[in-house]
Amino acid sequence: MQTLFLSLLAAAVTVHAYGSGGSNWDQAYSRAKDALQKLNQTEKVGLVTGVKWMGGPCVGNTYKPESIDYPSLCLQDSPLGIRFANPVTAFPAGINAGATWDTQLLYARGAAMGAEAKGLGIHVQLGPVAGPLGKNPNGGRNWEGFSVDPYLSGVAMEKTIRGMQDSGVQACAKHWLGNEQEHYRDTISSNIGDRAAHELYVWPFMDAVKAGVASVMCSYNKVNGTWACESDALNNKLMKEELGFPGYIMSDWNAQHSTVNSAVSGLDMTMPGSDFSNPPGSIFWGSNLEAAVADGSVPQSRLDDMVTRILAAWYLVGQDQGYPPVAFSSWNGGKANVDVTADHGTVARAVARDSIVLLKNGHGTLPLRKPKSLAIVGSDAIVNPAGPNACSDRGCNNGTLAMGWGSGTAEFPYLVGPLDAIQKRAAADGTKIVPSTTDDPTAGASAAAAAETAIVFINSDSGEGYITVEGNLGDRNNLDPWHNGNELVKAVAAASKNVIVVIHSVGPIILETILAQPSVKAIVWAGLPGQESGNALVDVIYGDTTPSGKLPYTIAKQAADYGASWINAETDDFPEGLYVDYRHFDAKGIAPRYEFGYGLSYTTFKYSGLWVNMDASAGAANGQVVPGGPADLFEVVGQVSVSVRNNGRVAGAEVAQLYLGLPDSAPATPPKQLRGFQKLMLQPGQTGRATFKLTRRDLSYWDVQQQKWVVPSGTFKVYVGSSSRDIREEGSFRVRRGW
């Protein structure tokens, strides 16, 4: 089935590669500078200023100049599909895409989203998400991003951006920087140490810039005491100078706080141009910016730079070549006059399916083998009776959970609920279904007692802080299942000898109560699977596909083990530093329940033949700055490979993972860090070779004194395995000091 998908994918997504390398930016800049000469001052200001909230068909719109052939730019959410429009595809969330660990699917998802955005006339799609990274396991918007690990998140950013922009839409990497919680997000100062900032939070943005991302969105919060959208250190020095970003920085909606400071500190576009209620005096740019340039408060060169960056991004992805007009309005129900979905449901189903993580499978409970009867228990098994889009921006948790809430959502064209999909399969198998689609423990136990096997559906939701759901102001109040999920599982487990638990969640939940039930034989994490939820689940639990997802974060035994959570204060000093998620667990010697990178299969894999070839010298990266950072930072300096054999009786995909431990000469470094992965699809008895190419950056740490990436001298440890703790092969290599 996975082999078949690749051929279907070619038909599902047609892209045209415009390229995102430095030479293409050079060409785009040349054209942008020519266009700049034709614009008057008011037109220039119009290109960098939103027309105000609800001032056009999209959530963000700019003014259309008359002097050049350039549109009113349409900017639209979200990172998992098109918000406020229909019909569109509601793709699995970023956290699911990350859980696939599949670079082909990451690209395909990005390309399909980009194709839909272009078809609707959207110029800038507001995604993907690298921040929040997810240092707080209950952070409200973690699910919009790909992983708590910067390396995995960075690869996902790169592949997604390339897919989106190859389809013709401008991508927007967000939220820059330190937006790790929803509580106090409009006022909090994220005080991040220089080294932790570079090695964790900036890292995936480096990959985004290297991939040629057109735009970056600065966040609501302060960073080290200064608003992110008017931070010279963050935007000019770090993003534009150190990372060599040629594109433009836009504000998050109403994240701008000044006229002059934001302009001279590197902001290039303000959105949406006014406060949401459009009060007088809420427009910082527009005529105010024009006046500031006229009196010299903002240099003319700064305004021209803003405009050039915005125009260059437009040329970079080829939007000057027959781009379609906007085909919907966000404010009248979003009905589009064109259907852009094609067969992107194929991509959505593949991502949802291959992101499913099998956490437990005692006694070979899964896959199901035509059981005589099945109890389906829990409200999470069915679609919200009021409809999948009944709550604005998905701001409720009624029925099965397939995406979180907030601006990072999309309208479901349909939602296949788990019960519906299982009933369809059960009818073909002759299996009797005994449903209990509430969260009442007594009713659930009654249904379970009447069936051979019971499947209990539980969930945990979160989202953006402008919506509060069941007392959760964006961030989750705790890491427990919602709707009394633990009690529901306990009741069902007391009534049935064979219980399977399916989890739809935005992030980790504490599973100790569930694991304490002897009759809970299998646990499946399905995340936020989007419109194809039920179909993808059936593909896996019935064995049509072997599960191949791996956790993009750690599941702890207790919430306190994470050492981080959102704080009820307006200052977060990021005391954990580099030690986030598995880095923290490893350094502190804390045993997780399920570690980062973990995921079971219906088959087994044997690793052998580790090979290491390295040609690196110690020292700092000093190359010319290119998009992403110093050019020599991205040079390949070595290679690691390992053989993986499928020892089982069914085909399966294994994610081989490479972790590196830096030498003792590197100060205060986590024991190991992810630095490579490859997903191998293997038939029974087949052996494949996973190969990991290592760059100087992969071997480096950020030296706060030198203000450079430095490869330390000494012995590096090499760990290759099936997860961050299931290490199958170990080795080492030595790096000597350069001359």
From Swiss-Prot:
Glycans are attached at N40, N224, N398. The active site is at D252. It catalyses: Hydrolysis of terminal, non-reducing beta-D-glucosyl residues with release of beta-D-glucose. One of its GO terms (molecular function) is beta-glucosidase activity. Residues 1-17 form the signal peptide. One of its GO terms (cellular component) is extracellular region. It is found in: Secreted. InterPro entries: Cellulose_deg_GH3, Fn3-like, Glyco_hydro_3_C, Glyco_hydro_3_C_sf, Glyco_hydro_3_N, Glyco_hydro_3_N_sf, Glycoside_hydrolase_SF, Ig-like_fold. Its EC number is 3.2.1.21. This is Probable beta-glucosidase L. It comes from Aspergillus fumigatus (strain CBS 144.89 / FGSC A1163 / CEA10). The lineage of its organism: Eukaryota, Fungi, Dikarya, Ascomycota, Pezizomycotina.
